[in-house]
Amino acid sequence: MSQAQINTLASLFDSAIAVLKNDGELPADWQNNSQITRTKDASHGDFASNIALTAAKAAKANPRQVAEKIVNALPENQDIRQIEIAGPGFINVFLNTEAKFAVLDDIFNLQAGFGLSKQFDGQKVQVEFVSANPTSSLHVGHGRGAAFGMSVSNLLEAIGYDVTREYYVNDAGRQMDILATSTYLRYLETNGEPVTFPVNGYQGDYVSDIAQTLKTQHADTYVHRFAEIAKDVPEDAQFEINADGEKVLLSGDKEAHIDGLIANSKALLGSGYELFLNAALSSILADIKDDLNDFGVSYECWFSERSIDSEIEPVLQILEDKGYLYEKDGNIWFKSTDFGDEKDRVVRRANGQSTYFASDIAYHKNKFDRGFDKVVNVWGADHHGYVPRVKAALLALGIDADRLDVVLVQFVALWRGDEKVQMSSRSGKFVTLRELRHEVGNDAARFYYVARKPEVHVDFDLELAKSQSKDNLVYYIQYAHARVCRVLEKLEASGLSVNDAMGAEQQELLVASSEEELIKLLAAYPATLLRSATGYEPHILTNYLKELAALFHGWYDSNRILPVSLTSGETPSADEMAMMQARLRLSKAVRLVISNGLGLLGLSAPSSM
């Protein structure tokens, strides 16, 4: 049954409900929130509705009695062969043969548009994802957010949303100062100045690479003695490793130490400090953009945190005017507990500096000021405590907090078979997204990142992702697509071609249970996309593609698509030609849906493997 026919079936039930309301069997204000679902067991029909069960309380009657009244009130429809009442009151609908094949017509008529809808046409949604600090290359954890955010964005577009993908560039604040100072200290080292590098500095080799570029460009123009930079700076943290292998602090304060180095670097360099900050920022941000672009992840907007500096004070003034700010211990606090948060939050410190939370309030107000109907934030699971305070701020500003959806994405662990891969080291090295992509390929990375619910940890098996077996779901799904392509190549090599008209005429030959199951599953694709998109659950689509590939492989292995006579150079009989064209039609439909689904997930659909 096509999506249009599903809508027709829903309309038939609405008509029956109208009759019951008119007869006084149901209250006039009763709202129909029932569901029409595809059955898994063919003996239960093609579709089932729970409408009688949902209406029973309002009708003050047994669900089966309500079901009988609904069935009796249903208008006739040529696509329906039979209707049964089952169990406690489910209404099972059996379609006639012609109606079952309507989905194949839809697939070939709509092509890449099959399954897409305009249900949310005209609504604007912003999806913000990754938004990693531009202080280092992206690691494998960021990769999951990238794959998830891009897939969700594609799915939302598939159901009609006008989607803006956004990366929030955290280019302001203390982390950028730590990066700038780390770069400057490495620059001193490249110029021969001995440096005691801070524990809290950025340790990676990429910082030294940026520093080397700056030396090439500016020689020793900005060199100062390290003693000047470290003057009056609190002692850095000193650690030892105890008998249990744990790092134990002996003395010093790494935070105070790096802050002192930052302050002295700014004072000594003056305007030159911005040179180091901007050089590091532009280099790392360019690397991030290249990495994501190579991963098939793109954005309509790269939004700079610096750009909202001027919006922070006005938004705090709004909160103050509304009575939601107060002073305590020199800090300015936001009354987030008034809106369900566990405690109030500081928005301006005693030293006059606004907090990161204050920037986030301004940023989220800015999002809705830009006219988005809905905003989706894809955050790491470690941000779970941050959600209530952001929603509290929106409520305080008079913005409907339900317009903000936050999806928390859990962490990723890498495995090689039974051995867990170390994700990082003390030297500052970590497994990057680029390294993962180069080892397993973009397709495997994109698929396995979204193949599980976002709130579930991902155990990424590197060896499995590279294997060519049915256990590797990416290979298994793509191989189904390639198999159809191979059949068409063999057909062409034999001097024959696909006859779409004959395939449509003969499709009623597809009566095997496996063929009926395939057609039924193809018909489920539009509803699958809708559910996957509205719930921000791309794993629903990966599961669907896995099921479709499995059904196809099983059918393919048990049924010949091309007649045996072709391999011996004989001309197929009329019956063989009829069955061949019918099965080619079904195969091409499967190929098209797999290609469409893989495309929404950002994966390729290879013609050979």
UniProtKB/Swiss-Prot annotation:
It is found in: Cytoplasm. GO terms for cellular component: cytoplasm. Its main location: cytoplasm. It is an enzyme of class 6 (ligase). It catalyses: tRNA(Arg) + L-arginine + ATP = L-arginyl-tRNA(Arg) + AMP + diphosphate. Belongs to the class-I aminoacyl-tRNA synthetase family. A motif ('HIGH' region) lies at residues 132-142. GO terms for molecular function: arginine-tRNA ligase activity; ATP binding. The keyword Protein biosynthesis applies. Keywords: Aminoacyl-tRNA synthetase, ATP-binding, Cytoplasm, Ligase, Nucleotide-binding, Protein biosynthesis. InterPro entries: Arg-tRNA-ligase (IPR001278), Arg-tRNA-synth_N (IPR005148), Arg-tRNA-synth_N_sf (IPR036695), ArgRS_core (IPR035684), DALR_anticod-bd (IPR008909), Rossmann-like_a/b/a_fold (IPR014729), tRNAsynth_Ia_anticodon-bd (IPR009080). Monomer. GO terms for biological process: arginyl-tRNA aminoacylation. Its EC number is 6.1.1.19. It holds the Pfam family Arg_tRNA_synt_N. The gene is argS. This is Arginine--tRNA ligase. CDD domains: ArgRS_core.
